[in-house]
Amino acid sequence: MDRSLTGPVKRSNAQAVAVPIGGCLIAIFSVLSYYLLLSNPGYFSHDELQWGARADVAHWRDLPWQAWTDFTAFQHRPLTFNLWLLITYAWFEQPALMHLLWVAMGLFNAALLFGCLKQLRATTLQSLGGAAAFAISPFAIYVHGWTATLADLLWLAAALALLQSVLRLPTESRWRAAFIALVFTSIGLLAKEAALAIAPLLLFAWLVSGRQPRLRAALMASGAVTAGYLWLRLPTLLYAPRPEGTYAWSLSMPLKRWAEMQLYPYLPTALEFASVSNASTTRFGLALLIAVVVAATFVIANRRIGATYLFGGAIAMGPPLVLAIGYPQYGYGYAALICGCGALAWPQLRARGQSVLLLALVLTSWHGYNIAREMHRIGAIQARYSPALADAVSAHRSRHSDTSTALRLALEVEADRGVFERLSRQISNYAGVAIGDQVKLVDRQQTHHAVIGADGSIRWAAGAE
């Protein structure tokens, strides 16, 4: 792209004061967030525990691999699933290593975004700012902190590597651009269906960048791979049986999903998208106001950057736009794109516009910290609860020959019911103990065998032992 994308730097006294203060706050939240992610002693949800059960085999050759050519599977993600099986087989019992790997992959994606911004002629400081804003965004913290998001890490890495590699080529270099696009689009689609967004994003990039030959060639190659993928997979994606609710789709959903993406970053206590709909009128209104002001700031700074923020951001969300339920990991690519827009728009903003972006960054970095803190809390609970649950199920089974008698557990803290439901859901086994449907969470007033403490420990009810 030409130099006009970044434009001349406009300095002000307000900037000289606001940038250091905002930067310090963002740095503090960043350090605290990644410390919490790296020191997390456990796991966030049932997904990791289910994969731990699948990978609990004697030898890695016995792992239940997904076939690379089974295009009838609802989730055809052989790159993700097979790599995840290997990682889980090796490190499931060492959560610290799992979290270290996820953070490393996440920061690698931030480094790829830095490289893309440099290729778009942003300064080193701008590029670093954009990459850092992405890494501390609530979307990224959610993905980097939950070790069930390998698919999101992989498809975005493929998309960013594609863009950076193509932008490094001479403008007229068509064949190399096409080959690069073919390879990385294929990698992305083998990782997650969200990579269907790569070709539309290349189309958008080609349109806003002066229709460069290298981007046109990349677009055609990526489009061909995407068309072939859809030819093989579209009937399955549209009509195959799927988990109830989670992957239901409707053409009435895109506006709602898009709105959630806009508002979620500015609701700093929200862990997942359900909190957007459940937010109070005041909090919802404030988030909406901030989102509108931020969007207007981009449009005023530069029309092309503003269009990329609004329309490119929607494209980056990809297929999840039509799903009935949204989750923060669906906004991972969106976060990379809008943070890149912020880096490119920064020098063209007046002091007021820069203050708006700084406020948004402080708010979103605080949000990211809150997510990291909650994930760390849940991880500490899981690290205690899962082994205790396996012991309790084993002890309960030894006293009840009738296997239809489920272990009934009450909660000490009812507010954490959702946490324990997720940590108990469809876990076939843990630490060699078969669990399956042998656990039932009940109200404290109902008959129960044991009580789950706030810290995840399990103590037997009076007379139950």
Regions found by a protein language model. Name each.
Residues D2-E465:
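Polytopic membrane enzymes that build or remodel cell-surface glycoconjugates and lipids
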